[in-house]
């Protein structure tokens, strides 16, 4: 078997639909477009979302929500992920080096998800009330 001899399994590929190639093909003359009208013409079709003059759905529905500008600069870190780190003092740089937060992140918050049984100290990081309680119960602290 060589790369130049590879081909799809028999019957796995359908032949391309060749329209407008004679009446015997079943798709000759009008090529499956019917007679006259806008949709039979070349380039004759409405734009996406056009509903024939009726107010389109995307304009009938109200605007909703917004795009947060701070989303890419903030991050959440699970408490269970901190347990896997080899250091006892954890700050934003440590999280970036471990790949737990992205390079653009400027602030991170620890959330209560998973468990921690080792003593850790958080420096310059936020924590939810539950995460703070779990860290302090394990003998850790927030600086």
From Swiss-Prot:
Region (Disordered): 1-57
InterPro entries assigned: Ribosomal_uL15 (IPR030878), Ribosomal_uL15/eL18 (IPR021131), Ribosomal_uL15/eL18_sf (IPR036227), Ribosomal_uL15_bac-type (IPR005749), Ribosomal_uL15_CS (IPR001196)
Domain of life: Bacteria
Keywords: Ribonucleoprotein, Ribosomal protein, RNA-binding, rRNA-binding
Compositional bias annotation for Gly residues: 21-31
GO terms (BP aspect): translation
A GO cellular-component term linked to this record: cytosolic large ribosomal subunit
Pfam families the record matches: Ribosomal_L27A (PF00828)
GO molecular function term, any single one: structural constituent of ribosome
Record flagged with keyword Glycoprotein: no
HAMAP family membership: Ribosomal_uL15
Protein function: Binds to the 23S rRNA.
Record text on subunit structure and interactions: Part of the 50S ribosomal subunit.
Family recorded in the similarity comment: Belongs to the universal ribosomal protein uL15 family.
Protein name (Swiss-Prot/TrEMBL): Large ribosomal subunit protein uL15
Organism encoding this protein: Ralstonia nicotianae (strain ATCC BAA-1114 / GMI1000) (Ralstonia solanacearum)
Gene name for this UniProt entry: rplO
